[in-house]
Every structure is written in C-alpha cells, then in structure tokens.
Amino acid sequence: MAYSRDEAFETHKDYKENVNLWEYYIRSFNGGYDYTLGQFLNRYNLELDNEYNQRLGNTPCDNHCKNIIQIYSSFLFRVKASRDFGAMADEASLESFIKDADLDGNSFDAVMKQAQNYSSIYGHCFLILDKPNITTNTRAEELEQDIRPYLSIVTPENVLDWNFKREINGKYILDYLKVREEVDKKGGTYFRIWYLDRIETVYAKSDRDEPVVIDTADNLIG
C-alpha cells in the first residue's frame, strides 16, 4: 500500500490536542536542560530574548516530579509480584520471556516497572506485543532460536494515529495503529503501521518527501 505525505504524517485528533501536554510532562520529569529548553517560564512584558534566556538559565529547579514518581514506583514494586499463568504455565518459551521480555535483556518485572514509570509521567503508555517474522520448519527450531513474542514500551507522543472498529456484537477492536518508531540522524522518520492482517514499515526522508514502504509482514499476533 502506498502512502502520501499527508497520510504518513497524519495524526489523530486526540494526539493533536494532547501532544504539547505530553512534552511538558516528560520535560518536567527529566528536569535540568530538557526543562530549560521547554521555556515554560512566563515572559514579562517587553522582556528581550537575551533577558528571558538569562532568567531561564538562572532558575534552579528541584525536580520533585522525578522524586515523587520514583518513590511511588519503589513502593509499588517493593514486593515481588505473584503471577498465575494458568494454562500457559507449561509453555516452553514462557521462562525465556519472563527473563528477557523485550529482547534487550530486561526481565518482565523490569519492563513493567518502566511502563509504570512512564504511565506516572504521561498518564498512560502503550505496551505492544510483537513476534519476529522468521520462518522455521518446526516448533523445536523456533524454541532453539528463541523466536517468541516480546514487549515494547511506546510513549504517547510516538503513537500518532489509531482507529477502533465496532463489531456486529458491539465490541470495539483496534484495527489500525501508527507508531513513530525512529527518527534517524538525517531527520528521516520510520513509521510502523499495524493492520489486522499485516504490519508495514514506512520511511520518509522528511515531511516534504514522499514516504516509501520498505517492508510488509504478516501480523502474526493480531
């Protein structure tokens, strides 16, 4: 499927309404230079740019936002979680997933703690479950190569667009999701777009260039 520039960079109306708030929240959590760059101090009437910048640089900020979130997170995770996996308890790849949930060496507990931190900052975050699109002949080969589902945390400012469809029985399902996956050193943007049957990776050199579909894969999870 080909995409126009407008389609690739289009964002949901809720995204447009909230993206500035999300930027304020993460800069407030990071504090320091990030907060200064946000220029959240109110300007005085007739204040020159150099005077405003000097005032920004001279305004110390004790980062209570980060302290409160870290204290709350420590309280929530001070006791190890107890989980009942039910019928999944004998799943061969479960232990590998619990030990390395994101394929970056972080345990499931560590990923959930990070998700909780982001939820405290933004009000919510997204956990996307995906599986590498690698073909094997047998389940044994899949287990040997550790081909299994993994989790990715996506923060709200990177979830650009989505759509829910109502089924005949009245249930809503998510049938479209567009995520900004990466911005490269040259300013190009990689988008990952989920549909019920497929996942497309789209690249645009800039918001002035036509986007290109660089990969299409079956949606193995749905």
Tell what function each PLM region has:
Residues 131-222:
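Structured, contiguous alpha/beta core segments that scaffold functional sites
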Residues 1-154:
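Extended, helix-rich architectural segments
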